[in-house]
């Protein structure tokens, strides 16, 4: 699968099965929330389910630990100062860390990365992270402001 260009070799790709765009929503599917924002393809985004987002956050937490057997640092590539990218980042040089697909190609991945950051770094509970991510992403342009969230202290 050659989906992430030069990132494929030195990376682990995580793809959520999600209609992403409202026009692909199946009848009676589990997806319920649609956000608007210029960062989304066509300006509208079907939010993954809470279960999908929780599983993604748990996987990222594990992948960035020594237990995984990998050397992936918990570095949020799209985070600069207190702003997290929701779309392309300037000069996306290949480097270790956690990337959203949209940082270098396509238009997906930013919302799950935002949710995971809120869970793993801000320490929010699942439902609070979900509602906060939706509120931050709704109408956002290129970035969301995370300055009001203190990063949890390492133990």
Task: Annotate each predicted stretch with a short phrase.
Residues 3-9, 90-94:
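Extracellular/periplasmic catalytic domains that process cell-envelope and extracellular macromolecules
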Residues 20-155:
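Basic/polar, cationic surfaces and motifs that engage anionic cell-wall
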Residues 10-23:
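Glycine-rich, acidic and aromatic/proline-enriched surface loops and short helix-turn segments
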């Amino acid at each position: 699968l050659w989906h992430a260009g030069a990132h494929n070799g030195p990376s682990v790709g995580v793809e959520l099965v999600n209609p992403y765009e409202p026009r692909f929503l199946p009848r009676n599917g589990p997806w319920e929330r649609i956000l608007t924002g210029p960062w989304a393809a066509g300006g509208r985004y079907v939010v993954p389910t809470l279960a999908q987002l929780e599983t993604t956050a748990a996987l990222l937490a594990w992948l960035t630990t020594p237990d995984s057997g990998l050397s992936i640092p918990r570095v949020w590539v799209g985070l600069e100062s207190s702003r997290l990218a929701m779309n392309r980042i300037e000069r996306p040089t290949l480097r270790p860390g956690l990337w959203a697909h949209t940082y270098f190609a396509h238009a997906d991945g930013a919302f799950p990365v935002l949710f995971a950051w809120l869970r793993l770094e801000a320490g929010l509970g699942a439902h609070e992270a979900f509602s906060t991510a939706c509120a931050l992403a709704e109408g956002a342009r290129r970035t969301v402001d995370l300055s009001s969230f203190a990063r949890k202290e390492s133990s």
